[in-house]
Amino acid sequence: HEGDGLMTSRSDQALVIKVADCQPILLAHNSGSCIAALHIGWRGNRAGFIQKGVKEFCQNYQLRPSDIFAVRGPSLGPGHSEFINFQTEWGANFFSYYNLHSQTMDLWQLSKDQLLQAGLTAQNIFSLDLCTYSLPELFFSYRRDAVCGRQAGIIWIKR
């Protein structure tokens, strides 16, 4: 997943993740000394990119996951994350996130659980539960419009 994550400890550099329906996940150490930004598409969720990104961030800056804050930005909500080929696209390990009736995945809950699995604490995980598909006046959505617009998740260190 080369290019799906960025990190820095420089105060003169913003990190930007551009998404349409994917999840921007912004990370910051509680001291404010280092930050990271992850682009999480469904394939990234499936591949455990959140856990890998947190691990790399912690190793690079000698951090404990429990000292990291995370914010998930607007993205495709649980009611619109349709996967009609669940078995081939996801598999049995993700069945608890799949709604068989609507054939949709709860990617928001999956990402939260993956952050917890990576060692973050529940009180340090924040979510903007705004669905890009459901709010056309606010967000681009490729799933809704088949047009490739983008919004940005931005994080920086202010000193």
PLM features: what roles do these ranges have?
Residues 1-159:
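Active-site microenvironment for binding and transforming phosphate-containing groups
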